[in-house]
């Protein structure tokens, strides 16, 4: 595939969540295939990676953001610049799980729409002895809030690549849905009601059950 084609498929993603949940670890594992044990707290880092997803080349522009409350104003700017979002909590931290809804509400408020492609992920799934949030709790919250869901491990790389791939797919499904809606405006049928409906597909990735969004 040509460079021009990949440049025409730039997808901007933002990874958000409470401090210390492993946002940077997940991102660097995806970008560089290695796990970082120690790093300085992130304010804002940007990464790029070319990926082949469903036989299509995409250039992913990934914004890794800070979780600190004092950076809320900056976070609004990050949200406006992105098309898809990955919300991270740690399965070893109940408080970070409780913050997921706050971050989702901020995204919805800033973008002023509720059909935003959002993937919710529970990181540190390898630390089962320290787990405070069950897989079912994560799945139930994601379903309630209309988000896709996976558990991942930045350390072992479990589901890390799948998270980014599925988020891109959700972004593209929304684009296709909006295009169909625009094309049907002058038609006889009214399909607009279906354009922002998410359907859930249960799949298995690396032996772990995941919940994936599909826009109709």
UniProtKB/Swiss-Prot annotation:
One of its GO terms (cellular component) is plasma membrane. Ras proteins bind GDP/GTP and possess intrinsic GTPase activity. It is found in: Cell membrane. It catalyses: GTP + H2O = GDP + phosphate + H(+). This is Ras-like protein rasY. GTP binds at residues 17-24, 64-68, 123-126. One of its GO terms (biological process) is signal transduction. It comes from the Eukaryota. The modification Cysteine methyl ester is found at residue 213. SMART domains: RAB (SM00175), RAN (SM00176), RAS (SM00173), RHO (SM00174). One of its GO terms (molecular function) is GTP binding. A lipid is attached at residue 213 (S-geranylgeranyl cysteine). It is an enzyme of class 3 (hydrolase). It comes from Dictyostelium discoideum. A motif (Effector region) lies at residues 39-47. Belongs to the small GTPase superfamily. Ras family. Keywords: Cell membrane, GTP-binding, Hydrolase, Lipoprotein, Membrane, Methylation, Nucleotide-binding, Prenylation. InterPro entries: P-loop_NTPase, Small_GTP-bd, Small_GTPase, Small_GTPase_Ras-type. It holds the Pfam family Ras. Residues 214-216 form a propeptide. It is a lipid-anchor. Its EC number is 3.6.5.2.
